[in-house]
């Protein structure tokens, strides 16, 4: 034993220094590895009385850490190790948990139960070192926790008014942190911190809800106000520019002033300048005395409580909810707010789409947003610019007057049989016999020919052009009247009437198309009235001249009327749209210059025509007749056909064609020719009354009034003729037929005269409007032929009273048709009407806005 001890002691004297160096290196390396792996250093309180231990209770068994000092290799160094450990306590490491505070020692629960070694020394056993996968997972958790904290802080940060709250919140957080550091009860501290965070989130989101909902509501009211101001500002601007054009000494000065005006208007229309959001939120009353400000704008500024009241109610509802429901509502609100607050980038594009539906027909007079497609395919706002040039009216008046003279010829030809048939059946005047059947064909063949002309007119205006097609009817009108004037038999009269009716069918289709493609929208309503007015003038002229002339002289007058029409048609150009359709861009530009004025900028309008033509070419390959048979197209087409049916079967053309004969059969005490003149004057004046009321009272109201007036007068006329034939003497009531005819014509001209033609252009879908209008026009001429051809036969078979009662019964049925099926289109854009009829919207062409040629025939 002593020898072993001496050898050990002697060996220890030489080996103590290497072992001490090794333990120092071991301590440094373990400390460094523990810091890198996120381990926590724990100092063990060792008793100096512990005299024996083994190195394997201190060192990990991994030889990677220190292979040179393994207890298995050097068991003789155990005693020396015990002596060294009396001066230097060992190290113990464990994983750092998420709940640990690096500034505080571990709790009793976190410390492991010490294991007793072979001696009396108590040491904490070391866990095995973590693997590389565990190290990566631990670092990932730390990064995710840091990112989550950063994201939570960014979500809770608000703008503007919340800065002060965050400062107070920072102070409260520091106070709570100090209190938590001083608190020894960790669970109590966590409860306080959680409660504070919930209170902060609630108060912050209440403020956010109130502010952002105010912002959203203010934007809605602001968009409505801007939509109104677009119209008012541009109207004022247009008048200003018109006055400036008259007063300007030079063109350069005018354009310079116009550019300055557009710049000021661009600023005034900018939402950030015209309608500050803080005025609504703060309830500013500084603008209360400004003149000319919109009433809605004032109400929003002076009564902000109207906006915030529903928001406060919603906040009270939120406060009454449970914590879970409130958190759900808050999350939903945050999702909405992330969309609504990005207003600077998206607000204008959204407003453009919304205002397209609101502005409707007013888009011509407003200052619209102009979109430009960028390289990435997204639309962006480029500039504001006006849509129209200053109106150069005189050339457009000349164009409208030229085609309206053709309408005068149409009206004269249509009313020819009413005064002419009386003298034509008189054997003392006519050299040939005209039987009752032949007389019915003289009146009825013109509508039949008009049906054929309407069908042929569609291809002709596309092949020859609008102007050339109208011009081509002038010579046949002259020939037809000369053929009737020089007739020696009924066949010549019928040939002349057929040729005249064929030209009437072509003209009635081409005249509205020409006006719609040449006249600017600002004057289209006024100039669009000229064909209707001139058509009724032609009817009145025929009635007045027929009271002094026989049928032959009246026909010679009809041959002279187309001459000024023929001359003026040579002075006006073809429509620009037709030139664009033929690829003649330069000729289209010249036509626009003639119509709009030499100084006008016609390039924007020309580009619009080219885009419309491109859209039409893309749809040209479709079979339009098959499109008519689709269910969503049949409804508007059926309504249009129904209105045409009730218009003609009200008996209007029978009354116009046979007015003199009706008054002669009635035995009226008033001269028949004078009665026709009075009816013509009423027809002419009633047209203007209908134009004034049609956009004020509405379409359906006027149809109701028109139908009721016709039903009453037709039944009264039927009763008069019945009493004259079978009943008591009514000779003392000779004024009654004229009174009934005046009321009948007045009622027809208010409603069933112009409205079926107007609604045909409104309710028919854009893609089938051309073909559907041709079908409706042809059907109208067919009904006209049936009524005029069978009227005299009806009076023979049923008596005059039976014919008028039949027409009255049909009008009575038409009243229910209007009530049930006809929609109200007053004040609605063509897009809105089509959306209601078909459930979708497309861009409408300018031709769709015209009022078709309409006069009583």
From Swiss-Prot:
Task: Please give the superkingdom of this protein's source.
Answer: Eukaryota
- Compositionally skewed regions (Basic and acidic residues) per UniProt: 134-143
Cross-referenced Gene3D superfamilies, in alphabetical order?
MFS general substrate transporter like domains
Induction of synthesis: In perineurial glia by starvation-induced hypoglycemia, possibly in response to TGF-beta signaling; dependent on the BMP-branch-specific type I receptor tkv/Thickveins and its ligand gbb/glass-bottom boat, which is induced in glial cells upon starvation. Not induced by insulin or adipokinetic hormone signaling, nor by the jeb/Jelly Belly-Alk/Anaplastic lymphoma kinase signaling pathway.
- Compartmental location: Cell membrane; Vesicle
Task: Give residue spans, biased composition: Polar residues.
Answer: 69-81, 171-181, 330-341
Q: Which residues are glycosylated?
A: 428, 550
Q: In which tissues is it expressed?
A: Expressed in perineurial glia of the outer layer of the nervous system that forms the blood brain barrier (at protein level). Expressed in the fat body (at protein level).
Q: Provide the membrane-side ranges marked Cytoplasmic in the record.
A: 1-392, 462-473, 519-528, 574-636, 695-700, 762-767, 823-857
Q: Say yes or no: keyword DNA-binding present.
A: no
Q: Which Pfam families match?
A: Sugar_tr
Q: Transmembrane: present as a keyword of the record?
A: yes
Q: Which residues cross the membrane?
A: 393-413, 441-461, 474-494, 498-518, 529-549, 553-573, 637-657, 674-694, 701-721, 741-761, 768-788, 802-822
Its chief place of residence is membrane
* UniProt catalytic activity: alpha,alpha-trehalose(in) = alpha,alpha-trehalose(out); D-glucose(out) = D-glucose(in)
Keywords noted in UniProt: Cell membrane, Glycoprotein, Membrane, Phosphoprotein, Sugar transport, Transmembrane, Transmembrane helix, Transport
Q: What happens when the gene is disrupted?
A: Pupal lethal. RNAi-mediated knockdown is lethal. Pan-glial specific RNAi-mediated knockdown results in severe locomotor defects. Pan-neuronal specific RNAi-mediated knockdown is viable with no defects.
- Chain intervals for the UniProt region annotation (Disordered): 1-28, 62-202, 249-269, 280-299, 327-346
The task this protein performs is described as: Low-capacity facilitative transporter for trehalose. Can also transport glucose. Does not transport maltose, sucrose, lactose or fructose. Mediates the bidirectional transfer of trehalose. Responsible for the transport of trehalose synthesized in the fat body and the incorporation of trehalose into other tissues that require a carbon source, thereby regulating trehalose levels in the hemolymph. Required in glial cells of the blood brain barrier to fuel glycolysis but not required in neurons.
What this protein is called in its record is Trehalose transporter 1
Identify the species of origin.
Drosophila melanogaster (Fruit fly)
């Amino acid at each position: 034993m002593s020898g072993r001890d001496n050898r050990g002691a002697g060996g220890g004297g030489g080996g103590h220094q290497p072992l001490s160096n090794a333990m120092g290196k071991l301590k440094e390396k373990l400390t460094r590895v523990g810091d890198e792996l996120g381990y926590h250093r724990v100092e063990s309180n060792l008793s100096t009385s512990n005299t024996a231990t083994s190195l394997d209770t201190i060192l990990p068994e991994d030889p990677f850490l220190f292979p040179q000092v393994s207890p298995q290799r050097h068991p003789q160094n155990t005693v020396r190790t015990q002596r060294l450990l009396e001066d230097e306590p060992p190290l113990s490491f464990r994983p750092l948990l998420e709940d640990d505070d690096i500034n505080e020692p571990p709790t009793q629960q976190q410390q492991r139960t010490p294991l007793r070694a072979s001696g009396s020394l108590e040491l904490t056993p070391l866990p095995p070192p973590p693997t590389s996968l565990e190290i990566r997972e631990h670092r990932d958790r730390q990064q995710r926790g840091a990112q989550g904290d950063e994201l939570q802080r960014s979500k809770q940060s608000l703008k503007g008014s919340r800065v002060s709250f965050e400062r107070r919140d920072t102070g409260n957080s520091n106070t709570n942190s100090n209190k938590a550091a001083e608190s020894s009860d960790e669970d109590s501290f966590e409860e306080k911190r959680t409660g504070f965070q919930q209170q902060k989130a609630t108060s912050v989101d209440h403020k956010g809800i109130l502010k952002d909902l105010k912002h959203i509501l203010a934007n809605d009211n602001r968009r409505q106000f801007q939509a109104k101001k677009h119209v008012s500002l541009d109207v004022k601007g247009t008048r200003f520019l018109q006055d400036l054009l008259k007063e300007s000494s030079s063109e350069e000065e005018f354009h310079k002033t116009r550019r300055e005006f557009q710049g000021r208007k661009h600023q005034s229309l900018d939402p950030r300048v015209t309608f500050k959001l803080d005025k609504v939120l703060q309830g500013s009353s500084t603008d209360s005395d400004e003149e000319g400000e919109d009433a809605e704008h004032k109400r929003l500024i002076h009564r902000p409580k109207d906006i915030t009241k529903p928001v406060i109610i919603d906040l009270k509802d939120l406060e009454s909810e449970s914590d879970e429901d409130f958190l759900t509502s808050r999350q939903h609100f945050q999702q909405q707010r992330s969309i609504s607050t990005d207003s600077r980038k998206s607000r204008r594009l959204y407003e453009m789409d919304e205002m397209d539906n609101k502005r409707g027909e007013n888009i011509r007079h407003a200052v619209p947003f102009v979109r430009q497609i960028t390289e990435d395919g997204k639309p962006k706002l480029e500039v504001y610019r006006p849509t129209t040039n200053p109106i150069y009216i005189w050339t457009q008046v000349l164009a409208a007057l030229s085609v309206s003279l053709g309408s005068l010829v149409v009206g004269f030809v249509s009313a020819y049989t009413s005064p002419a048939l009386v003298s034509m059946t008189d054997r003392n005047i006519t050299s040939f016999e005209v039987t009752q059947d032949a007389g019915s064909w003289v009146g009825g063949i013109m509508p039949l020919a008009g049906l054929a002309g309407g069908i042929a007119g569609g291809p002709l205006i596309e092949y020859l052009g609008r102007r050339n097609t109208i011009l081509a009817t002038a010579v046949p009108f002259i020939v037809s009247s000369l053929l009737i004037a020089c007739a020696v038999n009924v066949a010549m009269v019928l040939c002349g009437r057929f040729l005249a009716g064929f030209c009437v069918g072509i003209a009635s289709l081409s005249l509205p198309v020409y006006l719609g493609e040449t006249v600017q929208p600002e004057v289209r309503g006024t100039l669009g009235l000229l064909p209707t007015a001139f058509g009724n003038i032609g009817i009145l002229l025929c009635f007045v001249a027929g009271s002094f002339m026989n049928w032959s002289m009246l026909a010679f007058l009809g041959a002279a009327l187309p001459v000024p029409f023929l001359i003026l048609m040579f002075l006006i150009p073809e429509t620009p749209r037709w030139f664009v359709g033929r690829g003649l861009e330069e000729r289209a530009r010249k036509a626009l210059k003639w119509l709009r004025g030499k100084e006008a900028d016609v390039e924007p309008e020309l580009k619009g025509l080219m885009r419309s033509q491109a859209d039409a070419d893309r749809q040209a390959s479709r079979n339009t007749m098959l499109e008519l048979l689709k269910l969503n197209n049949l409804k508007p087409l059926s309504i249009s056909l129904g209105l045409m049916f009730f218009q003609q079967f009200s008996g209007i053309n029978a009354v116009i064609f046979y007015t003199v004969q009706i008054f002669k059969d009635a035995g009226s005490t008033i001269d028949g020719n004078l009665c026709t003149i009075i009816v013509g004057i009423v027809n002419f004046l009633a047209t203007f009354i209908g134009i004034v009321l049609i956009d004020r009272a509405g379409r359906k109201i006027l149809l109701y009034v028109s139908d009721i007036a016709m039903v009453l007068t037709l039944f009264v006329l039927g009763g008069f003729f019945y009493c004259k034939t079978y009943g008591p003497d009514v000779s003392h009531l000779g004024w009654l037929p004229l009174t009934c005819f005046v009321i009948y014509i007045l009622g027809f001209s208010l409603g069933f005269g112009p409205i079926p033609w107007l609604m045909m252009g409104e309710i028919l879908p854009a893609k089938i409007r051309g073909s559907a209008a041709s079908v409706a026009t042809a059907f109208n001429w067919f009904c006209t032929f049936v009524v005029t051809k069978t009227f005299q036969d009806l009076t023979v078979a049923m008596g005059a009273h039976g014919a008028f009662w039949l027409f009255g019964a049909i009008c009575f049925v038409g009243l229910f048709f209007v009530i049930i099926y006809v929609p109200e289109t007053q004040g609605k854009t063509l897009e809105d009407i089509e959306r209601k009829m078909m459930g979708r919207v497309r861009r409408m062409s300018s031709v769709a806005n015209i009022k078709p040629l309409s006069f009583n025939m």
